[in-house]
Amino acid sequence: MRKIAIFNQKGGVGKTTTAVNLAAGLSRNNRKVLLIDLDPQGDISASNNINAQYNLYHFLMEGADLSECTTKLGKNLDIVHCDHKMADAEHQMAKEKGNVNFLSIKFPQNMDYSYLIIDCPPSWRMLSKNALQYASEVIIPTSTDVLGYDSLEKTIKRIVEINKSSSQKTLVSSILPTMFDTRNNICKEILLRMKQEFTPLLVTEPIRVNSKLKEAPKSKMSIFSYDKHSTGAEDYWKFIKLVLENEYMYDLSLMQSQREKALKDYYVSGKKRELMIVDNKVTFGFKFVTNVSDSIKGHFIENSKKQKKAEHA
């Protein structure tokens, strides 16, 4: 079961849109998906007219059964929704002594789902920290503008921080550029910079600006149900195909060994960097340097020192 957190500490970057359409697209490919709305704003729940008696708050904080808190959205797609009470839950979580992860404790280890998609709040608080520690990977949607790029760097720094304090390392599988205007030079420059800084293996093809993506939630639909011929549907479908392609390279034992090696100190040109060590044959993401004091620079592999010596020989 792949547990994917959708996270960016900045709001308005297409995080919820990505969570909804990723879940919908995967379910259309015969994958059983549980969508977890962890954002106290409850945008997913509101846009789907969910008024179930029990929700995520009751499951995490009051001992309700998961089945009581789960609503069916469609074939192969369920949701655990939330509302403003999750803000109260966050305060209660913060009072707990020690590093208690409520999601890890409460959600069963083995569930009848292929994917868990977690829509995180756009903040660096307890709910987001719990989600990132619980998830096996994170997708970072980021708008293709200056503020979006700045937030991307800050978000990855946050992930580095939480990996330092946790035995379970969160791996970044994709950076998803959103709100890409093909006519705008700033968008083009930002996208190019993302690919240069984080490598094209990590940065996916962008989600273009498309009015249908804004209209779909008003009609309580995913973009695929609302307008399957729109550019929004086309772009998200490409992204979902990428997620599915990576699925066949998803080796849990390999990922576990990578986690054990992750965040080792690595020195390049006298500068301390933290590196996610990855088998070069695995294209399932994670190929990036995780530390940035000024900016995040490219991808280094373990033999880079040897390569430098060879160049100067």
Where are these regions (language model features)?
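P-loop NTP-binding core
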Residues: 1-313
